[in-house]
UniProtKB/Swiss-Prot annotation:
The gene is ppaC. The keyword Transmembrane helix does not apply. This is Probable manganese-dependent inorganic pyrophosphatase. One of its GO terms (cellular component) is cytoplasm. Belongs to the PPase class C family. Keywords: Cytoplasm, Hydrolase, Manganese, Metal-binding. It is found in: Cytoplasm. Its EC number is 3.6.1.1. Mn(2+) 2 binds at residues 15, 75, 97, 149. Binds 2 manganese ions per subunit. The keyword Transmembrane does not apply. The lineage of its organism: Bacteria, Bacillati, Bacillota, Bacilli, Bacillales. It catalyses: diphosphate + H2O = 2 phosphate + H(+). Its cofactor is Mn(2+). It comes from Listeria innocua serovar 6a (strain ATCC BAA-680 / CLIP 11262).
Amino acid sequence: MTKTLVFGHKNPDTDTICSAISYAELKKAQGADIEAVRLGELNSETAFVLDYFQVTAPRLVETVANEVSEVALVDHNERQQSVDDIDDVTVVAVVDHHRIANFETSDPLYYRAEPVGCTTTILLKMFRENEVEVSKTVAGLMLSAIISDTLLFQSPTCTEEDKVAAEKLALIADVDIQAYGMEMLKAGADVSKKTVAELLLDAKEFNMNGSKVEIAQINVVDVNDVLSRRAEVEALMTQNIVDKGLDLYLFVITNILTNDSVGIAIGSKTAVVEEAYGVKFVENQAPLKGVVSRKKQVVPILTDTFAK
């Protein structure tokens, strides 16, 4: 039997890690030889989740072609967000809830993408469709992913399907959604011990009409906890622009209590962000009122503005 590795995007978040583990458990129950791995370090929120449910973190890998010939992707499809040697392996499955971009294969594959707030919402359906029981531990991981991606159902990406899935998973996991959810989000929003690199850890790269754009996001309970270190943050952002040849680096600092954000933008295309949101950056900083979702409120708007 051919072994498969399953993983989410680089700079993994809670959905990426929990989806990889959950997908692997589903496939193992069906007799597959599969292992969940990760493409980067865990953030503090995900570390809290794994510790809470006593789950070992997936193994860290930098390449996969040296181990397997087939892989499955969760929570992403764009090649620049995936493992560096993605072109050297065959993608046999994708389960995702993002736009489809910069993705093609030479062979047919299983592709499941739905416009919901979280990948594990889709995975719960797959467990049910295949009549595979969701364990208490996996239910906890899947619930955590939904809470994370929907900001405890406050994000505009959240759908009724996500809420229903979360309720079902909470029953299996035997946790109180609101109490556990706030504890989890606050664990992720504590930036007091984070390095500057860790502040920018949740970053994704996009190709927007030929421009290289990187968008990082962090959730906090007070944006000033990050803005007080703005000089260090901007220095690292600038270094990333040089190292990666980026045209724009946008850092979205989201207050999970007010559901507003502050943006820091650096690069030759910062005017595109100003046009997209009708704001003016002063010393690289501007308010982004009501913006909490990179997937729904940042990427589509910037993509459309770059295309003008």
